[in-house]
């Protein structure tokens, strides 16, 4: 114990000296914020497991495997990872597993942000219900924290967020809105709305939350709005590669799942079959390679709704019948799962509340 304490003290001195030297440099290769992020990462690593973190004996790795298998056995084949709150998706994935990078991708209006928000809320609610000291961290690069919280309240109160923003709700709905808001005040969900955040800054903030509050999962909306390494001059594809590698590194370092949203290329719209493929991921090489799970959100009803035939025709009657069949459904196409099967999960999507839920017949 004394030897370990002396080692920690020596490492602290070393980190302090390196930080001081970096701060004294007159060249501007690193900003003050970069120096803070680097130092905090070193301190976090030292506080967690010291410099031997990357070197693990097989016996220790095997103990972790036994612990994982024991938890799975006790759950009778149920959820071992962080629950998504969607039964069929959890059955397919077994929950969202620590150290995994999970990609949710889709074209605009498919509902990828809605799905990520639903999962974040469900995971945070699970933490709250179990009394665990932990949290969910949501990096919202596209929407403000107010817009994101409005969505969540809309989902739970079952009031259209569009009507909430316009003030077009009844007194009863407003009372329900306030009551729902009151019930969510203790939800262990943190929102970071920093635009164009760098992977280094994201890692720093995640470590801080994990140290202070505990952290079960990170959600990032979305990859293409992030920044890679400062002053990157190798092109956008290389920058996306740095970002996905960084997200995977954060997942491994903090031993949590990282859920990251991604755009798809426009070539999806140019095909007769609009179901996305792995090759449709924008700057796809590194996203596909670095991820553990890739799932696409696809709604046939969205495309069908844009092809409405002339009313009072046989074609319109057939179109309406098809819309009644699929208009409220969404498919989650799991096209990559490193440690499990691929496949499709069908969910219901309540567009007015931006809410996904299990189908009645599943």
Question: Language-model segments: what does each one mean?
Answer:
Residues 91, 122-214, 228, 345:
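Cytosolic-facing regulatory segments adjacent to core modules
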Residues 1-75, 79, 110, 133-134, ...:
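Short, small/acidic-rich helices and loops at N termini and domain boundaries
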Residues 86-95:
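Pre-Walker A adenine-sensing motif
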Residues 113-121:
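Motif I (Walker A/P-loop) of helicase-class P-loop NTPases
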Residues 102-103, 137:
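Short hydrophobic/aromatic beta-strand immediately N-terminal to the Walker A/P-loop
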Residues 172, 202-215, 234, 245-254, ...:
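C-terminal regions of RecA-like/P-loop NTPase motor modules
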Residues 137, 215-260:
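Helical hairpin unit composed of two closely spaced alpha helices linked by a short loop
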């Amino acid at each position: 114990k004394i030897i370990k304490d002396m080692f920690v003290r020596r490492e602290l001195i070393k980190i302090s000296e390196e930080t001081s030297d970096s701060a004294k440099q007159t060249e501007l290769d690193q900003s003050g914020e970069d120096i803070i992020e680097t130092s905090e990462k070193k301190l976090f690593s030292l506080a967690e497991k010291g410099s031997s973190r990357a070197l693990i004996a097989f016996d220790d790795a095997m103990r972790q495997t036994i612990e994982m298998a024991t938890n799975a056995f006790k759950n009778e084949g149920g959820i071992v990872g962080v629950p998504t709150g969607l039964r069929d998706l959890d059955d397919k994935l077994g929950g969202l597993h620590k150290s995994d990078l999970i990609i949710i991708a889709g074209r605009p209006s498919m509902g990828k942000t809605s799905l990520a928000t639903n999962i974040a809320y469900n995971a945070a609610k699970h933490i709250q219900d179990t009394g665990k000291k932990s949290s969910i961290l949501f990096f919202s690069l596209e929407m403000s924290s107010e817009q994101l919280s409005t969505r969540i309240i809309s989902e739970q109160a079952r009031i259209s967020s569009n009507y909430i923003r316009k003030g077009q709700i009844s007194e009863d709905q407003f009372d329900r809105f306030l009551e729902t808001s009151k019930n969510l005040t203790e939800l262990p969900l943190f929102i970071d709305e920093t635009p164009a955040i760098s992977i280094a800054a994201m890692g720093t903030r995640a470590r801080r939350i994990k140290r202070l509050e505990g952290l079960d999962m990170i959600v990032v909306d979305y990859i293409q709005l992030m920044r890679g390494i400062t002053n990157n001059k190798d092109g956008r594809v290389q920058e996306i590669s740095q970002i996905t590698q960084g997200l995977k590194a954060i997942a491994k370092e903090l031993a949590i799942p990282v859920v990251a949203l991604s755009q798809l290329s426009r070539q999806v719209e140019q095909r007769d079959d609009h179901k996305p493929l792995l090759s449709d991921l924008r700057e796809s090489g590194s996203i596909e390679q670095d991820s553990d799970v890739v799932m696409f959100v696809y709604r046939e009803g969205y495309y069908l709704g844009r092809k409405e035939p002339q009313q009072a025709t046989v074609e319109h009657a057939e179109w309406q019948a098809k819309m009644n069949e699929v208009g409220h459904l969404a498919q989650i196409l799991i096209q990559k799962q490193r440690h499990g099967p691929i496949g499709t999960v069908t969910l219901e999507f309540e567009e007015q509340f931006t809410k996904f839920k299990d189908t009645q017949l599943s």
